[in-house]
Amino acid sequence: MVAIRPDEISTIIRQQIESYNQEVQVSNVGTVLQVGDGTARIYGLQQAMSGELLEFEDGTVGIALNLEEDNVGAVLMGDGFGIKEGGTVKATGKIAQVPVGDALVGRVVDALGRPIDGKGEILASETRLVESPAPGIVARKSVCEPMQTGITAIDAMIPVGRGQRELIIGDRKTGKTAIAIDTIINQKSEDVICVYVAIGQKASTVAQVIDTLTQRGAMDYTVVVAANANDPATLQYIAPYTGASIAEYFMYKGKATLVIYDDLTKQAQAYRQLSLLMRRPPGREAYPGDVFYLHSRLLERAAKLSDALGGGSMTALPIIETQAGDVSAYIPTNVISITDGQIFLSTDLFNAGFRPAINAGISVSRVGSAAQTKAMKKVAGKLKLELAQFDELEAFAQFASDLDAATQAQLARGQRLRQILKQPQNFPLSVWEQVAVVYAGLNGYLDDIATDKVIDFCAGLREYLKTSKPRYVEIVSTEKQLNDEAEGLLKDGINEYKQAFK
C-alpha cells in the first residue's frame, strides 16, 4: 500500500476547493393567484417590466400588461389550460421579439413569427422587438415616390406614395381586402416587399387570400402574418406590430415595403377585451383610454426614410370596417385622424355594380399627389372634379324634366367616366394603360360610344396601343411622363382604334 503524505492530502483538498465553482441562479419568480379568460394575476414579480415576457410552469408565455401595487396582470399567448392556481411564474427579463429577415419571404407565420404553413422551420438571420420606436423627424423624408396600386380610380384620384399611410374604410363585403390584394399583386415588377397581416379573420378567408397570391406569383415577395379568429386575443393584439417589425427590417435595409393591416377594427376589439379583463377603466364604446395610442404607435412606424438612412420606405394600408357606413364611430375617426388620407368604399356603389366601389367625394389622399407620376397628374387633374359635378347633376336631373344640351353632355360624359373606372378583381393595370383610358374619357373620345360599350372599347384600346404604338408604351413606362411625342401617339392610337371599333 502506497503511503500518502499529509502535505499531499492538504494539496489535494486545496486544489478541490479552488476548482469548486458555485453557480447561483437568481430568478424573479411569482405565484399564480388567478387564471382564466386568457389572463392571469400573479403575486410577486416585484421587478417585472411593463411588456416583459413571463414563463409559466406549463411552458405558456404571457406578457405583463398591468403592474399593480400587490400583483401583476398578465395576458397569455396560449390557451393556458395547463396553468394552475399556486403555480410558479418566472420573469424572463426579455421584451417580445420576432424573427426577421429574408427567410420569412414567401412564408406564412403566426403573431410570434412561428411558421404555420407546414414548410419547416424558418432560419431567421436576426430578431427585432415587436414594439420598436417609430423613426424621428430627422430620420424621415417627405413622400416623393408613387406606390402604384394598379387600380385606376386610386392612382388617378387618390394617389398613394411610398411611406404614406392610406386608410381603406368601408362596410363589410365592399371589397376592402380586394383592393389590398390587388395592390400586392401590382408590386410584382416593382421590387417591393409586401407584408399582409390578417387579424381575427376566418382561417378559410386567409387560406383563400394566400391561394390568390400564390396563383399570381405574389408570394415570392410577400410575408403573411395570421392571427385567426380562434387565436388568443393577445396574438390578435400583437399581430400588427409583428408585421410592422418584419417590414422594418427591409425598410432599414433601404428597400420599399408595403404593409396591409386587415383589419384594425378586430385588433381594437381584441385590445378592448384584454383591457376589460385586466379591469382597466372603460371609456367611449367600452374601449380603454389608450386605444388611440394603440393605433398611432403602430401607424407612425410607416415612413419614407432619409437618404442618410438608405431611403427605404414602409407604406401602410390599414383597413377599418364600419357599421352601416358610420365613419364617425370611435375607431374610424381615430384612424382617419392618424392616417394621411382614406379610400372610402360605399355599399350603394358596390350593389349598383361599380367595383371597386370607391366614393370619390369623401376619399382623399393628403400627401400622395406629391408622389403621383407626372403622366397621370397631367391627364387626371380634373377627373375628381368632373365626377363630383356629375354626382351633383345626376341627383338634380332626377327632378328636372327638360335639361339643356350642355347639362346632357356633362351627364353623358360622367356616365362614361364612371365606366372607365370599373375594374375586375385581381386585374391591376400598368401606368400607361391607366393614362390611356383616363385621357380618352376626359378628352371626349368616348362621348359618342354607347355607355355599355365603354368597357369593351377600353380593353380593346389597351391591346391596340400595346401592339400598334409600342413607342407610347415605352415612353410612359420608362419616363413616367406624357410628353408631346407620347400624347401625339396616344391621340393617333385612340382615333385609329375608334375607326376600327365602329
Swiss-Prot record:
Pfam families: ATP-synt_ab, ATP-synt_ab_C, ATP-synt_ab_N. It is a peripheral membrane protein. Keywords: ATP synthesis, ATP-binding, CF(1), Hydrogen ion transport, Ion transport, Membrane, Nucleotide-binding, Thylakoid, Translocase, Transport. It comes from the Bacteria. It is an enzyme of class 7 (translocase). Its main location: membrane. The record marks S363 as: Required for activity. ATP binds at G170, D171, R172, K173, T174, G175, K176, T177. It is found in: Cellular thylakoid membrane. Transmembrane segments: none annotated. The keyword Nucleotide-binding applies. F-type ATPases have 2 components, CF(1) - the catalytic core - and CF(0) - the membrane proton channel. CF(1) has five subunits: alpha(3), beta(3), gamma(1), delta(1), epsilon(1). CF(0) has four main subunits: a, b, b' and c. Belongs to the ATPase alpha/beta chains family. This is ATP synthase subunit alpha. It comes from Microcystis aeruginosa (strain NIES-843 / IAM M-2473). The lineage of its organism: Bacteria, Bacillati, Cyanobacteriota, Cyanophyceae, Oscillatoriophycideae.
